[in-house]
């Protein structure tokens, strides 16, 4: 709430902050009330002892004081727990209760003095030990309470409190000159107060001119940021809790929406179809990522002995002590003759720690050339090393490790980069620009780079490349230093780990992508804070405080695991009403105009290391490890502070190092993320990526049997998850890796005996499932197509992230021509392991049908007649089977294949080759365009003797083809040939294999004005397969692929 006003002055404490102090004092006074009552009324005193009589009189008076304190503290507790954060009317009488409690405190102070007098007179001469001990305890307790209250008053004292009250009273009247004078006085007083706090914070450091300037600049920055803001520190804590709950609620709401492209949230960042994962299967990409991990060791070493001991608290101290000359051998030289060390401590611990860091990592080819431990405002420590293995000269800059570094961080105004000959406005973080200029000046004065490149001419150090690295403050300084050094070193590279968010202007940020690679881990706070980001954060914080109707103590306690209940308002209408009614109560909080800060962004191309959040297990169960992924981040996406307990922990340098390594570990274990139109990874926020793939076998539905060979398709009616689910709640039932119902073993075996293609795919799917389990691949499902959703309808579940298009016509098996039997199969999964190519499996199994090529030409199979007559839409599969059985007994039954001369064929048939290419084309991930006929009207190759060409099209087909000519973006992609297929990506890349609009929305290609039967007839994809040899004009089997 706003600061409480007592004695006509505002204090930096709210009336709802007194709950815990009042409870503590109430319990303390209650305890002493019970003890003193037992001592006074339960013991017998000697009437001849003066000390005992004085104790009884003093104790009775103190009992009354204790009783008064208890009553006043109960009233404070009751009042403090009423109302909301900004709803202060129920607590208006708090100041009067405090007046009463302070009056009682004065009486306590008098009784404490009387107790001291009694102790000086009777403590040595009194023989009653009980009386002496009780009196001594009361006196000590009284003085502890009094001193605590005095210290609290000093802490919550606001020097500008009187001016603030006057300004608020004046603002209620018409604005005049007095209002502006009071506002100016308030801002100056706040700046002076902040400057005083900074000086107290840095009381042990020597003050220089630059440091004094930093004090003034940061003080005015804080005064500007908290101007006219009537909140107390506890309000910020409660606001953070509410803001975190709001962010989580928004993410869940986004996942519940049907009209968005967000598949999941990893580390608070949305994952969409356009999210680019690092393709670690690409050798060039893998080498680049390993280079990023390698140079993180140089950035970590720059922190010297504090970080070395933090990483190795036990053996690290022994390693440093063994190398320190001041501890063991003062006369022993510690470094090579060419090493320069500036302003290290007497033992040289920082330089020794840097050296030990590389030795522990077996990096013996790294030579330290120069080490500067000089630490001041705008002057950051750094070191220069030569890496002979990589043939690089490395400049590593230390991050924030001292209060002086914090002053450099807080000087966040925009400063022009001292670089000439560029286009646009290049601005940077002022503190880091000054630090980069200092390092550049130091390198030139000491000729450090000349020494490094001339370190060992025999090894060719003259031709080594230059690398600049840093973490946190060092990352921002390294990026700006790269701007200053790039004119002399055009091949320079920079690696910035956890850089600050408000670092570079947009023009400079775009240019830095040519040579800067930045790394951000998870929900790290630092890459998301700058002046512009903090201003937006302040507005969000005030907004959640305005909308909150709960008491502050309940909000803060609700953030703990004891009471994990959301304190966000449930009824949005009620919240809006309450907020509008409180608008006039605190207008200064709600109408604050944000300052016009120049937007600054993180530098370079950003590698964002994200991870999922496994469900919390019970205390007796082992917690699962999160799975880490690396994606390419957008510099402008880090514009919002994500509130999380990990936002500070994930900024530590050794935690960043662990996160980078875990990406490689997960990749080596086979934990990749691959999404396509028919293969969708379950959201890592819901399902932990573990090797255990749980297949839930569900019973078949009751009803009439389906036609032979028709794959079972049931409606997928599950709703999209709205919150993070546990692993058991997110287990998927798979049918050949398709989301839907699972065929029973008997039904699967029966279908396999009748259909060789289904037999082939069933064995392939089993092998793929076993290998995916052994490779710890992520759970993957194929989007099922229910009989209540069209071919272009995607279920909007959280596990897939697709949007659902409701109300489309039901899908039935509608045949347009009197052709052969239909094979209804599920498409194979895009190969993630090259050894499991669906094309390879098909070609190997084609030996079963090689006899068709040897004994029966394609012309005989197709027949020499014209186009087969069209079949009425009302025809069923049973009628077709009956017709097929009456047309000559030479036609082999469906699914029955004979062997040629008792052996298998040696090469596949052209029809199976075409079918294999079609299967591969379903999972084409390239960006080529296609016509409608390329995928929806696939025919057999034209033959000079075959009349099986394009037959007359129905009106529905002609209208669709005509529409596809004018709307080329609505058609699927072309089939991808196996030989020219792109390398599989290890990142999530969803191929838009279904029609999309210009806005990314899924569209229905069904022409208007057609019946459902005619529309569904166009959804069939045909390819021809021979049904046997020795048959006269044979019916062509339609192979309908249901992408599920």
Swiss-Prot record:
Active-site residues, Swiss-Prot/TrEMBL: 472 (charge relay system), 524 (charge relay system)
Region (Disordered): 848-897, 1013-1044
Consequence of gene disruption: Deficient mice are viable, fertile and display normal physiological behaviors. Deficient mice show 80-90% reductions in brain 2-AG as well as the downstream product arachidonic acid (AA), in particular in neurons and astrocytes. The endocannabinoid-mediated retrograde synaptic suppression of neurotransmitter release is absent in the cerebellum, hippocampus, and striatum of knockout mice. In addition, reduction in adult neurogenesis is observed in deficient mice in both the hippocampus and the subventricular zone. DAGLA deletion increases anxiety-like and depressive behaviors.
Keywords: Calcium, Cell membrane, Cell projection, Endosome, Glycoprotein, Hydrolase, Lipid degradation, Lipid metabolism, Membrane, Metal-binding, Phosphoprotein, Postsynaptic cell membrane, Synapse, Transmembrane, Transmembrane helix
Activity regulation information from UniProt: Inhibited by 1,2,3-triazole urea covalent inhibitor KT172, DH376 and DO34. Inhibited by p-hydroxy-mercuri-benzoate and HgCl(2), but not to PMSF. Also inhibited by RHC80267. Diacylglycerol lipase activity is inhibited by the phosphorylation of Ser-784 and Ser-810 by CAMK2A.
Top EC group: hydrolase
Cystine bridges: none
Coiled coil: none
CDD domains in alphabetical order: Lipase_3
EC number: 3.1.1.116
Gene Ontology CC annotations of this record: dendritic spine membrane; early endosome membrane; plasma membrane; postsynaptic density membrane; postsynaptic membrane; varicosity
Modified residues (Phosphoserine): 728, 730, 733, 744, 784, 786, 808, 810, 835, 849, 954
Pfam families in the record: Lipase_3 (PF01764)
Subcellular location: Cell membrane; Cell projection, Dendritic spine membrane; Postsynaptic density membrane; Early endosome membrane
Molecular-function annotations in GO: hydrolase activity; metal ion binding; monoacylglycerol lipase activity
Catalyzed reactions: a 1,2-diacyl-sn-glycerol + H2O = a 2-acylglycerol + a fatty acid + H(+); 1-octadecanoyl-2-(5Z,8Z,11Z,14Z-eicosatetraenoyl)-sn-glycerol + H2O = 2-(5Z,8Z,11Z,14Z-eicosatetraenoyl)-glycerol + octadecanoate + H(+); 1,2-di-(9Z-octadecenoyl)-sn-glycerol + H2O = 2-(9Z-octadecenoyl)-glycerol + (9Z)-octadecenoate + H(+); 1-(9Z-octadecenoyl)-2-(5Z,8Z,11Z,14Z-eicosatetraenoyl)-sn-glycerol + H2O = 2-(5Z,8Z,11Z,14Z-eicosatetraenoyl)-glycerol + (9Z)-octadecenoate + H(+)
Protein name, entry field: Diacylglycerol lipase-alpha
Organism: Mus musculus (Mouse)
